[in-house]
Amino acid sequence: MPKFTLKVLWLDNNVAVAVDQIIGNGTSPLTCYFFWPRNDAWEQVKAELESKPWIEEKERIELLNKTTELINCWQEQSKKYSFKEIQSKFPDFIFAGAN
C-alpha cells in the first residue's frame, strides 16, 4: 500500500502538485502546492522530499517520477483530453481542483 500520494490542481496556465501522506483512510499534507511552469515544481518537490530524511529514497524517486509524468502530461496533453480522462490516467492522485 502506498504511503504517499500527489494532490493536484489542474489549471489552464499552471499545474500544481503537493505531496500528502496516506494515513488510514485519509491523507495529511506534507508539502504546500508547487506550481509549474510558474516555478520549477519538480525541483521544489525534490528539495522538500530531501529535507525529510524519514522518507525512503525509493519513495522519493517514485514521487518524483510521478511528478514528472504529471507535468509532462499537462504540457503535452492538457488540450487533447478532458479533465475526466486526465483523472482516469492518474487514478492514485487526488485532484483537488481544475478550471
UniProtKB/Swiss-Prot annotation:
Swiss-Prot/TrEMBL keywords: Chloroplast, Plastid, Ribonucleoprotein, Ribosomal protein
A GO CC term attached to the entry: ribosome
Cysteine disulfide links: none
Predominant localisation class: plastid
Gene3D superfamilies from the UniProt entry: 3.30.390.140
Gene Ontology terms, MF aspect: structural constituent of ribosome
Top-level division of the source organism's lineage: Eukaryota
Annotated compartments: Plastid, Chloroplast
GO terms, biological process: translation
Pfam families: PSRP-3_Ycf65
Family: Belongs to the chloroplast-specific ribosomal protein cS23 family.
Database matches in HAMAP family: Ribosomal_plastid_cS23
Quaternary data: Part of the 30S ribosomal subunit.
Role noted for this protein: Probably a ribosomal protein or a ribosome-associated protein.
Protein name as annotated: Small ribosomal subunit protein cS23
Organism the protein comes from: Guillardia theta (Cryptophyte)
Gene: ycf65
